[in-house]
């Protein structure tokens, strides 16, 4: 699904088990139908799969939920947001990728904000305010407010945090920026 490789299931379990923090697993794998339920059996709090990597979305979402996990559905930039709508009532999170998945440090794709706006309207119309609308990719102090104003409420900030001189301070600044935009 993506050209690079990070952790296999066993290594992921070690990391998840060692953490006292809630863990969100975002699977960028070729066969989410198999991997989703396997990762749902770990101590992770939530498991997000990609629509594009799943042959039977309803079955896979149900299998993850059956393990007591929060369930997320992600889409790549080239995938229409409409594919998510039939599953909204089964989800705890909709993830809109704002870069092509696979590598950090890419530029934020502003054109994805129309998808975020559409998803936010659906969630409000269907009274699903507890479903998180997440962005992943190119999140920084310059882009987080754009995403928040479009309707996103949850953000994955990789390079902005890990390449900063003070990662903890950067997390605080990103949170403050997003919260200001959400007011």
Q: Where are the regions that the model predicts?
A:
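N-terminal active-site wall of soluble small-molecule enzyme domains
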Residues: 1-63
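Glycine/Thr-rich beta-alpha phosphate-binding loop at enzyme active sites
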Residues: 1-6, 10-11, 77, 85, ...
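Alpha-helix-loop-beta-strand connector modules within alpha/beta enzyme cores
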Residues: 5-25, 63-72, 112-133, 174-183
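Hydrophobic faces of well-ordered beta-strands that scaffold small-molecule active sites
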Residues: 23-27, 47-49, 71-75, 94-96, ...
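Active-site beta-loop-alpha junctions enriched in small/polar residues
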Residues: 28-32, 52, 76-78, 99-100, ...
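Catalytic cores of alpha/beta
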Residues: 33-41, 79-91, 138-155
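Conserved, mostly hydrophobic/aromatic
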Residues: 39, 94, 119, 136, ...
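Glycine-rich phosphate-binding active-site loops on the catalytic face of alpha/beta enzymes
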Residues: 47-56, 95-107, 150-170
């Amino acid at each position: 699904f993506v050209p690079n490789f990070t952790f296999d299931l066993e290594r992921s379990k070690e990391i998840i088990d060692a953490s006292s923090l809630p863990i969100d697993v975002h699977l960028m794998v070729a066969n989410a139908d198999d991997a989703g339920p396997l990762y749902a059996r770990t101590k992770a709090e939530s498991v997000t799969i990609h629509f594009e990597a799943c042959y039977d979305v309803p079955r896979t979402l149900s299998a993850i939920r059956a393990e007591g996990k929060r369930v997320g559905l992600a889409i790549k930039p080239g995938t229409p947001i409409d594919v998510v709508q039939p599953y909204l009532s089964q989800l705890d999170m909709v993830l809109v990728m704002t870069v092509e998945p696979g590598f950090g440090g890419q530029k934020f794709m502003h054109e994805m904000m129309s998808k975020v706006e559409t998803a936010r309207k659906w969630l409000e119309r269907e009274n699903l305010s507890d479903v998180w609308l997440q962005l992943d990719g190119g999140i920084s102090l310059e882009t987080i407010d754009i995403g928040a104003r479009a309707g996103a409420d949850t953000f994955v900030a990789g390079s902005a945090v890990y390449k900063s001189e003070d990662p903890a301070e950067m997390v605080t600044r990103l949170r403050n920026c997003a919260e200001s935009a959400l007011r």
